[in-house]
């Protein structure tokens, strides 16, 4: 069997979203990595400017988070607002301070210029918890979680 490739004939377009990246709370990907408040290389929100610029340069189209094994024990409500709850991550066996959460992730995606792709916790989470997260991120101002986002300084939905 022989195939002939006609490079002048396009049969469709490839979505740039096929070539995304992900970050996870593993070793130094986030803490002491892309998110490092107090580091001289970090901006006013704690994001490493050099890493943000590198991600812009390679044109990351979509960034998945909380990504990998970490998501199976991540409870988003503990990483939002003023009273954050640290937790022991069973996958990586480390204490996570939860200082990088939903709002920080969305801010980071905006700085990079990429689409956020939020993974949900199907390991120890519930469908209701996932639904609450959708409300927090996407509803304008109806519901307690949308109002919580507004109280946290984000007037507009993230979608």
Regions found by a protein language model. Name each.
Residues 1-159:
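Non-catalytic accessory regions flanking glycosidase/transglycosidase catalytic cores in CAZymes
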């Amino acid at each position: 069997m022989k195939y002939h490739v006609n490079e002048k004939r396009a049969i469709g377009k490839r979505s740039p979203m096929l070539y995304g990246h992900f970050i996870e709370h593993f070793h130094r990907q986030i803490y002491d990595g892309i998110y490092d408040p107090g580091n001289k290389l970090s901006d006013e929100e704690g994001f490493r400017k050099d890493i943000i610029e590198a991600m812009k340069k390679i044109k990351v189209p979509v960034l998945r988070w909380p990504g990998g094994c970490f998501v199976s024990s991540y409870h988003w409500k503990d990483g939002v607002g003023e009273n954050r709850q640290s937790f022991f991550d069973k996958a990586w066996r480390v204490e996570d301070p939860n200082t990088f959460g939903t709002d920080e992730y969305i801010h980071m995606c905006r700085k990079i210029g990429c689409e956020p792709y939020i993974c949900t916790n199907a390991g120890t989470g519930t469908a209701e918890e996932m639904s609450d997260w959708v409300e927090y991120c996407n509803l304008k101002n109806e519901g307690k979680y949308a109002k919580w986002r507004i109280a946290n300084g984000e007037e507009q939905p993230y979608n």
